[in-house]
Amino acid sequence: MKNLNFTIITFYQFKKIENIINIKKLLKEFCSFNKIKGTIILADEGINATLSGLNEPIDLLEKKLINLKFFNLEKKKSFNNYMPFNRLKIKIKKEIVTFNEEGLDVDKWSGKHINSSDWNDLINKKETILVDVRNNFEVQIGTFKNSINPNTKNFSEFKNYLKENLITKKNNNIAMFCTGGIRCEKASAYMATQGYKNVFQLKGGILQYLEDISKDKSEWKGECFVFDNRVSVRNEMKSGTYELCHACRNPISLNDMKSKCYEKGISCPKCINKTTKIKKQNLKERNKQIEIAKKKGLYNPYIKYTPSDFS
C-alpha cells in the first residue's frame, strides 16, 4: 500500500527522557521543515506520537528518532492518499497517556504481549475475560466479539472500573486491547501492581490486528475509531464509513447523516440539543469560510490536503 503518498506513523516508547526541552525543539524543527503534521506528546516517562507526511520524510523521521536515542519504539505504519492532520502539535505533559497514577513503572510491570496470530485463540477460551480499555464513544462503533465495555469517559476512569468489577478476578486470565497498545501498557502495569496475576494485551493494538488478520478470520466487529481525519478504519485497514461531527467531535454513522438532526459541520443526533444557537451560527460561519477557501485555493485546516499541496 505504500504507493499511497502519505505515511501515517504511530509510535510510543516508555523510557526516561532527559533534556526534554531540547528534544521538543529538535523534533519541531525537523517536522516543520519536512512538512510532517500530527501530535507528539513528550513526558519524563517517554514519547507518544501520531504523525503523517510524505513517505520519504517519514522514513527520515525514523532515522532522526534513532539519533535521539529512541531505539525501541513500538510503532505502526499505514498509508493514505491525503494528509489526515491539520497541523503539528508537540506538547510536554506529565504523562504520555493520562492515567493519573504516579510512579507506575511500565517497563517492569506491563502484561504479556500477544501477537495478532495468537489473539483469537486466547479470547475464544471460556475462561478468558476480554476487556476493551478504550473510552465508551470508541467502543460504540466497533469492538471484539464478547468483549466487556467498561463505559469510561476517559482512560483514568479505568481504575474505578477494575475496583468495582474485577476485584475478585485477580487470578483469572484477563485479555485487554486498545487502539495501538499504549493504554494497555499502563493498564496492565497498574493491574500487576494491584495483584492481578494473568494479564494479557494485544501487541500493536487493534490497528495491528486489523492489518494482520483477514476479514474472514477476524473476531473484530464494526470499525475502529482513530484520532485523525480518517475517523475510522475497518478490517484489513480499509477506510471506514464514519465521519466526525465538527460540532461535538463524535463519530457519526451513515444513518446519523440521514437524520433530520444532521447538518454537516453544525449538528448531529448526538449534539443537536446540546449546542446553543450562537454555537450553531458560529459553526455555519466556519462552514462558509471552508467553502470560500476551497474555491480560492486558500489554506483551511478542515480541508484534506493532497500531495500536490506539499510539493
Language model features by range: what are they?
Residues 2-112, 135-174, 182-311:
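Rhodanese-like catalytic fold shared by cysteine-dependent sulfurtransferases
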Residues 110-115, 122-123:
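A conserved helix-loop-strand patch within extracytoplasmic ligand-binding domains
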Residues 130-132:
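Structural scaffold elements adjacent to functional motifs in cytosolic proteins
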